[in-house]
Amino acid sequence: MNKLSVVILAAGKGTRMYSDLPKVLHKIAGKPMVKHVIDTAKKLSAAQIHLIYGHGADLLKQHLADEPVNWVFQSEQLGTGHAMQQAAPFFQDDENIVMLYGDVPLISKETLECLISQKPENGIALLTVNLDNPTGYGRVIRENGTVTAIVEQKDANPEQLKITEVNTGVMVSDGASFRKWLARLDNNNAQGEYYMTDVIGLANQDGLKVVAVQAKDLMEVEGVNNRLQLANLERHFQRKQVEKLLLAGVTFADPARFDLRGELTHGKDVEIDINVIIEGTVRLGNNVFIGAGCVLKNCTIADNVEIKPYSVIEDAIVGNNAKIGPFSRLRPGAELSENTHVGNFVEIKKAQIGKGSKVNHLSYIGDAEVGHHCNIGAGVITCNYDGANKFKTLIGDNVFVGSDSQLVAPLTIASGATIGAGTTVTKDVQENELVITRVPQRHISNWQRPKRK
């Protein structure tokens, strides 16, 4: 039986989160918890992913619109068994069904593969964990290695309370067996709900085997009910990411002060200072230094690049030997060639900066092409927007643009041109021309400053 489908329970409200956002949409590492679980299901090559939803239906569908899930509505939240009953009509007899939870985001593909491999024919494989303090959790009762029951804390006798192995709620069985047991569930309990733990007893009644597989990492099966638990899982996840990067050769000034909210690939001798955030897909070359407080999102950084503190780079490409920052911003579409310098309080948007060119201070370069070996002075602005449309500025090679100049697009400045400081350029400039529109300087001798009356 190789076919596999996954059911993800995500209908709960999450009252203890004190939020209008459904609990499963709260984020770990910049991604909704339920999206972590969906991604893990994809890694298992699940034929179908059934998502049980209820509270916050519109928000869930909005956030997960692109996900390949079968939406299964649970109008009332009447327990885990009731949630599985909603998905049961979609189960095929000959497929394995894995039951997961949208608020248990760190469950791994490897743990689930181990669980699936241990499932007995027509029986159940149940994921469990040992806790130093199992108070409040359902105890796993075994006889001769087989799980015979899950006993809740309030129903356990003194001997059962000594058991430290508890139920995580994650289980796998075949579709036919699940449908059979789900049809036999009842809600004869104090809460009036249908519980999946009762399936264990039903399997035993049918003479079928229930095996327990213990999770190696407690945090994989930790659920989230409040923001403290969310924060604890966030820190655990970040520690695991940093450990992998450290072992792969990345240097961190302080591993506890780094956040990875996506995917990071890197070359050799990469050094990352404190409070750096990586989002989306980021690729770093060799000998890259990232200063304190930088944010990088969906960008490619080549070899020998220095990114000084508090720079923000998004959807951009940076060439070899570039220097960026401090306090630089590269917006989507920014492309820096090799040996470029972009300095403090410079913003580059949808613009290409040629080899060896410098934009060192207090400038905005948008919708532009800057040639090789240009010098863009402090306070230069490409005026690319007329209130309705965007226009482009084209600058050739070896151009010098003096400080506090405005380049009003559409505009072409040919190679070798010089723009004097304080110039507003509104017409195209030819090769090797000097353009200056500065008001003539006046000197007034013996000037008396106004005095207060």
Swiss-Prot record:
One Pfam family named in its UniProt record: Hexapep
Positions of Mg(2+) binding: 103, 225
E.C. code: 2.7.7.23, 2.3.1.157
GO terms for MF: glucosamine-1-phosphate N-acetyltransferase activity; magnesium ion binding; UDP-N-acetylglucosamine diphosphorylase activity
Pathway where it operates: Nucleotide-sugar biosynthesis; UDP-N-acetyl-alpha-D-glucosamine biosynthesis; N-acetyl-alpha-D-glucosamine 1-phosphate from alpha-D-glucosamine 6-phosphate (route II): step 2/2; Nucleotide-sugar biosynthesis; UDP-N-acetyl-alpha-D-glucosamine biosynthesis; UDP-N-acetyl-alpha-D-glucosamine from N-acetyl-alpha-D-glucosamine 1-phosphate: step 1/1; Bacterial outer membrane biogenesis; LPS lipid A biosynthesis
Keyword Cytoplasm assigned: yes
SUPFAM superfamilies reported for this sequence: Nucleotide-diphospho-sugar transferases, Trimeric LpxA-like enzymes
Residues annotated as the enzyme's active site: 361
GO biological process, one term: cell wall organization
Region N-acetyltransferase, residue ranges: 249-453
Binding residues for UDP-N-acetyl-alpha-D-glucosamine: 9-12, 23, 74, 79-80, 101-103, 138, 152, 167, 225, 331, 349, 364, 375
Protein name: Bifunctional protein GlmU
Organism: Histophilus somni (strain 129Pt)
